[in-house]
Amino acid sequence: MDSQGRKVIVVDNGTGFVKCGYAGTNFPAHIFPSMVGRPIVRSTQRVGNIEIKDLMVGEECSQLRQMLDINYPMDNGIVRNWDDMAHVWDHTFGPEKLDIDPKECKLLLTEPPLNPNSNREKMFQVMFEQYGFNSIYVAVQAVLTLYAQGLLTGVVVDSGDGVTHICPVYEGFALHHLTRRLDIAGRDITKYLIKLLLQRGYNFNHSADFETVRQMKEKLCYIAYDVEQEERLALETTVLSQQYTLPDGRVIRLGGERFEAPEILFQPHLINVEKAGLSELLFGCIQASDIDTRLDFYKHIVLSGGTTMYPGLPSRLEKELKQLYLDRVLHGNTDAFQKFKIRIEAPPSRKHMVFLGGAVLANLMKDRDQDFWVSKKEYEEGGIARCMAKLGIKA
């Protein structure tokens, strides 16, 4: 709470999951799927202890996904369906989760780098006009990730469910002109794994199966350090073969699919996306920065988001970055290469790094009403332009 007794709330709206809680805490109070479902056929009132309602949000929606028409309000990190997003926020602030009176609360929201102005403006409008929050602050996710690591300068590689961003931050400011975006993330890896399993004769094309394959992916997939070697192992041996028990009791075996699915992060052409992979984008991003900041950036690369949790990802990224630097900057000069230092930080809590940074920042700033929080009064008097100006954003 701030000095006036108002609760300070932090909400990290991800494409796949909402993480919400309070300033000063080191873990979200609630994590739930950012999905909305409506019954396909109203044939029954209850399933187990869950009542089937006309509108289901979050965990209940995920558990009953076989019976529902599922909609994800966010896509690639950006809100596409505001009506359904409002249902997700009703769930967040209502008795099911935080159970707050917005008029007595300050709210810190997170946004992806390169968030369109129209998206941010609509978010302010909804939070002030529909919910009536006392005051609001919007922070860029990459900056919050660095705060959670105790850093002000570094490059954040943030890959969640809907989008991957590489965002350099200098002295606490996100450098948007250098930010790289890749529209490949967790959801695309799940879709590609479904396709690979289909080629093996396993059919997972129902929307309900999507969650099953997502859980399978999180349990079994990894990033190959050496793709050719893994391909040989998959072809010639059964070393990579692991079994997975489906919810209905059937058992399936996964082999090469375990590394082939997440490989699209490094080789987007596998799913017909003509973009550079993760290592190329990261290298290009750092090399495009000021020559004085490059060494700092190479020494402070921070991974964030659930899709960076794959075993093997930090070492593969480091290997490819070093190779790119040796080939393109040093032109094969191995003596100079000995002095090149690179450090990739992969904190164990990186799935929730954005929330943690938000909780730290909101706690530090909870009483800085004049120069930090945008109040409802300021919004009503000066409109969206005043809000953007206070946040230091050109409207």
From Swiss-Prot:
CDD domains listed in its UniProt record: ASKHA_NBD_Arp2
Highest rank taxon of the organism: Eukaryota
Gene Ontology cellular-component terms listed: Arp2/3 protein complex; cell cortex
Keywords per UniProt: Actin-binding, ATP-binding, Cytoplasm, Cytoskeleton, Nucleotide-binding
Binding-site positions, ATP: G160, D161, G162, R214, Q215, M216, K217, E218, G305, G306, T307, T308, M309, Y310
UniProt cross-references to PROSITE patterns, sorted A to Z: ACTINS_2 (PS00432), ACTINS_ACT_LIKE (PS01132)
GO biological process: Arp2/3 complex-mediated actin nucleation; epithelial cell migration; gastrulation; morphogenesis of embryonic epithelium
Gene Ontology molecular-function annotations: actin binding; ATP binding
Cited Gene3D superfamilies: 3.30.420.40, Actin, Chain A, domain 4
Phosphoprotein is among the record's keywords: no
Cell compartment(s), UniProt: Cytoplasm, Cytoskeleton
Disrupted gene: phenotype observed: RNAi-mediated knockdown suppresses the memory retention defects of the msi-1 os1 loss of function mutant.
Assembly, per entry: Component of the Arp2/3 complex, at least composed of arx-1, arx-2, arx-4 and arx-6.
Annotated family: Belongs to the actin family. ARP2 subfamily.
General function of this protein: Functions as ATP-binding component of the Arp2/3 complex which is involved in regulation of actin polymerization and together with an activating nucleation-promoting factor (NPF) mediates the formation of branched actin networks. Seems to contact the pointed end of the daughter actin filament. Plays a role in time-dependent memory loss and the retention of conditioned behavior over time.
Protein name in UniProt: Actin-related protein 2
Gene designation: arx-2
